[in-house]
Amino acid sequence: MKVLEKKLPVTVLSGFLGAGKTTLLNHILNNRENLKVAVIVNDMSEVNIDANLVEHGGSNLSQTEEKLVEMSNGCICCTLREDLLMQVRELATEDKFDYLLIESTGISEPLPVASTFDFRDEDGNSLSDVAQLDTMVTVVDSANLIRNYSSTDFLKDKGESLGEDDERTLVDLLVDQIEFANVIL
């Protein structure tokens, strides 16, 4: 794969479930000022509810000039990571978008998503050849942050986990999401 002269800038939105990522994404899309934007929405469930909210949330994505990619039934930080690599590479090499927004699922850790951009495959190709990770945004539910931060609950006890072996606590995930962000909303 060749290195593109103009790399596709990418913003990744993370934050726990219900923090407002999809609301923020819709706000950004409604105020994009003629930029051609591609969007990847990741949801753990089989039915990508967040993608549906974006598609029908008044963002008016142009079907001919813009693209909404749904990545469902897994997490882009682990089980769908290879799919993320392929989708970002495809969108970047199409060379028709000004920006890429990625909304990760609420239980996703930002570090593995970001490291996807530095990963080099066996042929020496990397997403960093065609795309530039511009901003890592974490959306925080400020009304519940203190309560969640002092919680000892495991994600799986809340019905939210990456699988049976997921031993993360809610506070571990919140710390990962907040510490890795360069923008917190």
Where do the protein language model's features map onto the residues?
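Nucleotide-state-sensitive switch-loop elements of NTP-binding domains
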Residues: K2-E167, V171-D172
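Well-ordered beta-strand positions
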Residues: T135, N182-V183
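Structured helix-beta-strand junction loops
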Residues: L35, F180-A181
